[in-house]
Amino acid sequence: MDFKDYYKILGVEASADEKAIKAAYRKLARKYHPDVSKERDAEDKFKEANEAYEVLGDKDKRAEYDEIRKYGGQHGRPFQAPPGWQSRGGNGGGGGFEGGDFSDFFSSIFGARGGNPFGGGGGRQQRSAGRRGQDVELELAVFLEETLNKESKQISFQVPQTNGAGQRTGFTTKTLNVKIPAGVTDGERIRLKGQGAPGVGGGANGDLFLTIRMAPHPLFDVEGHDLIITVPLAPWEAALGAKVAVPTLTGKINLTIRPDSQSGQRLRVKGMGLLNKQGERGDLYAQLKVVMPAQSDAAARELWTQLSEKAAFNPRTQWSK
């Protein structure tokens, strides 16, 4: 069994406070989330970050871990808990955003916990008959196109399982079809009642909480419910005007570029943005950007020379005032 340096996994110092630990975890969770990352080992890194936050995000588990860390464990090196080591117990539970399988190292430290071998996991269970199931937190990556899609998005996540005594026995994978609400924004938290862990002894199921993370788009920037797209133009298109095919979330449109258009100018396309809470769409703004050719042949340079001689234009006239 190898030692796991949870501080190193999250990339924080051992003196890091709760806020820094949570921020580091969220950054890694977004980076390696299976719905977002294309890296081959993303799932393993995601689970590793989740396990680290399960420990460091809870003061009781962190205190136990810090105590055993004093025995000189090094990340990735063989490790064995000291003789007679026994978990100090406690309700605990950093409440990592998504459940997952924990390592042998985790189990060797926290698996002997009386009453609930893995702690409360951030749930709201009570120590009485008919206990409510644990809530589950999950970050959900949403693409801009999906906010306009009327179809449901299928998600899979891990739900903790318990026995009749309320002791954690493992995890099971649950799959749901989720409708993305109109007007959803980055960081918004959505509650799905009763979709968390099952209750114990007839208790109610926990809830599933989805924290929305809008995935970056290669073409569009977001400003509220409006979209911004940069439209490259050749110098002659800006000077003479043109019809340009511009992408939107639902297909291309033909945008009219008026003669003598300026770089940086924004053209508004009404109703082609994102949905708001009322189901109305914002606007699309096409920001013009004049782009020079990378290379010019002799004939093209001759035309530029003729233009420079005939055009009575100085873009720096304001400097002479």
UniProtKB/Swiss-Prot annotation:
Chief subcellular location equals cytoplasm
Compositionally biased residues, Gly residues: 87-97
> The organism sits in which domain of life?
Bacteria
Keywords, A to Z, come to: Chaperone, Cytoplasm, DNA-binding
InterPro entries per the UniProt record, alphabetical: DNA-bd_curved-DNA, DnaJ_C, DnaJ_domain, DnaJ_domain_CS, HSP40/DnaJ_pept-bd, J_dom_sf
* Cellular component GO terms held in the UniProt record: cytoplasm; nucleoid
Which stretches does the entry tag as region Disordered? 74-97
User: What's an example of a GO molecular-function annotation for this chain?
Assistant: unfolded protein binding
Compartment(s): Cytoplasm, Nucleoid
Pfam families linked to this entry? DnaJ, DnaJ_C
Q: Which PROSITE patterns match?
A: DNAJ_1, DNAJ_2
Domain J, by residue range, is 5-69
Is Membrane tagged as a keyword? Answer: no
Role according to the record? DNA-binding protein that preferentially recognizes a curved DNA sequence. It is probably a functional analog of DnaJ; displays overlapping activities with DnaJ, but functions under different conditions, probably acting as a molecular chaperone in an adaptive response to environmental stresses other than heat shock. Lacks autonomous chaperone activity; binds native substrates and targets them for recognition by DnaK. Its activity is inhibited by the binding of CbpM.
Q: HAMAP family of this UniProt entry?
A: CbpA
- According to UniProt, the name of this protein is Curved DNA-binding protein
| Taxonomic path | Bacteria, Pseudomonadati, Pseudomonadota, Gammaproteobacteria, Pseudomonadales
